[in-house]
């Protein structure tokens, strides 16, 4: 890989420029450095920022991505900003594993983390019905979130949803503030086509982006995917222990 791009959140401009200088000195060509992604083909995009910045990049590029944590948690990042020397060695030696993540298609749109269907603050609770191959489920709630394994450590987790390993071929469906205590998350295989119908229009939010109001949405796994480059010593279990304290031995 010789041609690189660097996409960064605005506050990390000086760090991105420093990375670019180092890469140039190491005979790598950096095609662009910026907080916007131009229509230029590169071999690898470096993403400096948090998971939100990484998601923006994932929606705009088709080449492999490698993230540098410049936010709070950075589940999608492979390195910290202080790990650049290690990244440079891995880049020279092509010492990477490919971590493939698939998008979820919601109607005509795509999402990497989750689909959030949520009422307005002054709107009454909604009736939601979910249809899939084996039947249907009903919820009376403020909304619904359908998460990919990638998104399972995000908003879905804060609603009580499970953590899914990245290679699990499933989605998790979790109601938002349901009326009934028994309304819990359900995991469905990702080869299912899911239809969600609501009794009134509510907001459709994909990866934090507002796509207007809907009363029905069809969901299915997309063939569209991204490739995240990870160092060969990357370990997802270690990552969630460090970032969330999950499964960590305290005594």
Curated annotation (Swiss-Prot):
GO biological process, one term: NAD metabolic process
Cofactor annotation: a divalent metal cation
Main localization (coarse): cytoplasm
Subcellular location(s) per record: Cytoplasm
Enzyme Commission number(s): 2.7.1.23
Binding residue positions for NAD(+): 51-52, 56, 113-114, 124, 140, 142, 153-158, 177
Active site: 51 (proton acceptor)
Disulfide bonds: none
UniProt xrefs under SUPFAM superfamilies: NAD kinase/diacylglycerol kinase-like (SSF111331)
Pfam annotation, one family: NAD_kinase
Role played: Involved in the regulation of the intracellular balance of NAD and NADP, and is a key enzyme in the biosynthesis of NADP. Catalyzes specifically the phosphorylation on 2'-hydroxyl of the adenosine moiety of NAD to yield NADP.
Protein name: NAD kinase
Organism name: Thermosipho melanesiensis (strain DSM 12029 / CIP 104789 / BI429)
């Amino acid at each position: 890989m010789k041609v690189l791009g660097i996409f960064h959140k605005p506050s990390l401009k000086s760090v991105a420029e420093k990375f670019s200088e180092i890469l140039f000195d190491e005979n790598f060509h950096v095609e662009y450095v910026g907080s916007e992604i131009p229509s230029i083909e590169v071999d690898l995009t470096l993403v400096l920022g948090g998971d939100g910045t990484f998601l923006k990049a994932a929606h705009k590029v088709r080449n492999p991505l490698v993230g540098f944590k410049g936010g709070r948690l950075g589940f999608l990042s492979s390195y910290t900003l202080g790990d650049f020397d290690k990244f440079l060695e891995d880049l020279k030696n092509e010492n990477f594993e490919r971590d493939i993540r698939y998008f979820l298609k919601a109607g005509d749109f795509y999402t990497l983390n989750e689909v959030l269907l949520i009422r307005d603050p002054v709107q009454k609770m909604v009736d939601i019905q979910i249809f899939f191959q084996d039947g249907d489920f009903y919820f009376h709630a403020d909304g619904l979130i359908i998460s990919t394994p990638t998104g399972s450590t995000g908003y879905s987790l804060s609603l009580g949803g499970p953590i899914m390993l990245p290679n699990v071929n499933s989605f998790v469906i979790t109601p938002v503030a349901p009326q009934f205590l028994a309304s819990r998350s359900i995991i469905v295989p990702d080869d299912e086509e899911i239809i969600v119908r609501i009794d009134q229009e509510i907001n459709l939010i994909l990866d934090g982006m507002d796509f207007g109001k809907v009363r029905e949405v069809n969901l299915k796994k997309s063939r569209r995917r991204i490739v995240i480059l990870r160092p060969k010593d990357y370990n997802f279990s270690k990552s969630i222990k460090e970032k969330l304290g999950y499964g960590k031995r305290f005594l």
